[in-house]
Amino acid sequence: MWNDEDNNPYGSFERRDSFASSTNPASPTARDYSIDARFPTPQDVRYDAPLTPSDAGDDEVPGPTYPREASDAATDDETDDQAHGELVPRRKPGGYDSRIEQMLYENPELPILITEAGKSQESGGRFIVYTIKTGDLTVRRRYSEFASLRDALTRLHPTLVIPPIPEKHTMADYAANPTNAKQDQQIIDLRKRMLAVFLNRCRRMEQVRTDGVWWRFLDPNSSWTEVLHSHPVSSIPKQIMKAPPLDPANPTAGHSFLPVPSSSAKLKTLPTQALDSAAAASLARFPPDANSLSEQDLDAYFIAFETSIKDLESLLTGPMEKVNRRTLNHLSSLASDLSELGARYNAFALSETAPTVSAAIERVGQAADSSYIATEELSTSLSASFAEPMRESAQFAGVVRNVLRYRILKRVQQEMTTDELNKKKALLESLERSEAEARRIDQYLSSSQQIQPPRREPPAQHRRDGSGEDTASIDSDFPPTHSDFSQAPSAKIGAPERTGGSPSHKKAASTSITNKIFGPIRHAVQGVVDVDPERTRRDTIGKTRESIVQLEQAQIASAKDVKDASASVLKDLKRFQREKEDDLKRYMLAYAKSQIEWAKKNQETWEEAKAEVNKINES
């Protein structure tokens, strides 16, 4: 139950298992039409109880049934059975890891409800938490945890159209209400409705329901932080393009060698020129047999689908949104005017003395009051059952474009891998030709040296010895006294050997200075100039061969990724198209139902007022 201290509707929970309603009676969620316009009433819902003992009382009222959608992992026969409501409870082979998993597996149509929204007692009342009820199990999650769940699902299933969640607070919200923007009751009620829709849409997706992450979000015994830091979420590569599309948490060795295209990369060759709206409309929405078409042929269908989605998004976020907002504002203004008009008629009736006239005027005032209430309900009903789903459809358009963009990036990645592999093969061929040419030249030079050995000059020592002998023979012709001049003078013995050692010292000093100045330059030049081109060429050949082996693995992985991504995206787009058509049908019916109910209420009250006014003439 709520702590109503200070009249705070967001008071903290007094106990964790509390299910008392905290909904503001004036909010849209407290009205029957907000659920009826989208889903049946809770009394109309029946589902099989889980096969495990129930922890809650038998007086729990199950939640509303959401529209049934065919599972994208089911066969054609299973899809037909689901469409006719013939889905029967089933058992999972191998057992269950959690009670919530058993409930969802055996009762795939079990609705998920968000019953409450309020400040969390554990966080000191700083955060708004949403109470999620699945059968008889409840768990509380913050909006940021919903956002992290959706982010994890988009990384785990990049080829699936994961439903959107309500947007975060905008800067305009904080500017308009800087202190209580996060506690705005209308925004909280909106999030309650749309987050429940998000969870139930995920429930109808077979891959999401069985990936081991989504149902842990609903498990009260699971720590969401631990789930995000454990397999499979933690095993997904940081760069999603280096992971397989159907199982990103288990990439192969070849995926680590894949190049990563930029987010704005485009295909080199498009199948046709950019399709406009008319050309996209003339093309069939989906290919008749995707298995017999190449990736280039499938590109045209994906481009046509993306064009139609862009047109839908521009329509929903442009004229439709403006007209919707203007209509709701007019209805709110009309309701205020009717409220004031009813008050004026009631005051006027008190001043009238004639009983019949006074009663007639009072009845007109009551009719105006009734019209005020009906118009206010109509405005809120259209906002909840029509305007909000239209905004969600616009968000879906952005999600679809991201999924199609992922497939395009996979195609670009395949082209980049093929181009890089061709470049490496051409480089290897060039290096091998250079190596063969160098070996041929070495072999030719070796054979030439064996046939005509070059003439060898006498060694330098031999020449010096010969010159010494000649000098000795010349000196022998002179008297010995002439040899005294060849000796050093006597002054050389006593004098320091400064003159003899000075040139060598100067030369060494100049050499060290030169090394300091030109050493780094010489080192840099040696780094640029290949001192051993043959060894460098052999090393380059080895590295190139290794790169080719890696790129061949990457090419195999990329080809499989593109094929799997195209098949999975096409399959999920078909599911999304069926769901979108059903949603639009439901939105239009909800719009018509709201208008009919509003008109019936007004007709009934004003006919009663007319009958009361006619009594004046009779009297």
UniProtKB/Swiss-Prot annotation:
Keywords: Autophagy, Endosome, Lipid-binding, Membrane, Protein transport, Transport. The PX domain binds phosphatidylinositol 3-phosphate which is necessary for peripheral membrane localization to the perivacuolar punctate structures. PROSITE patterns: PX. May be required for cytoplasm to vacuole transport (Cvt) and pexophagy. GO terms for biological process: autophagy of mitochondrion; protein transport; reticulophagy; retrograde transport, endosome to Golgi. This is Sorting nexin-41. GO terms for cellular component: cytosol; endosome membrane; phagophore assembly site. Belongs to the sorting nexin family. InterPro entries: AH/BAR_dom_sf, PX_dom, PX_dom_sf, PX_Snx41/Atg20, Sorting_Nexin_Autophagy, Vps5_C. Residues 454-467 have a biased composition (Basic and acidic residues). Residues 1-95, 444-510 are annotated as: Disordered. Signal peptide: none annotated. It is a peripheral membrane protein. It comes from Neurospora crassa (strain ATCC 24698 / 74-OR23-1A / CBS 708.71 / DSM 1257 / FGSC 987). The lineage of its organism: Eukaryota, Fungi, Dikarya, Ascomycota, Pezizomycotina. The keyword Amino-acid biosynthesis does not apply. Residues 108-224 form the PX domain. SUPFAM superfamilies: PX domain. It is found in: Endosome membrane; Endomembrane system. GO terms for molecular function: phosphatidylinositol-3-phosphate binding. A 1,2-diacyl-sn-glycero-3-phospho-(1D-myo-inositol-3-phosphate) binds at residues 142, 144, 168, 191.
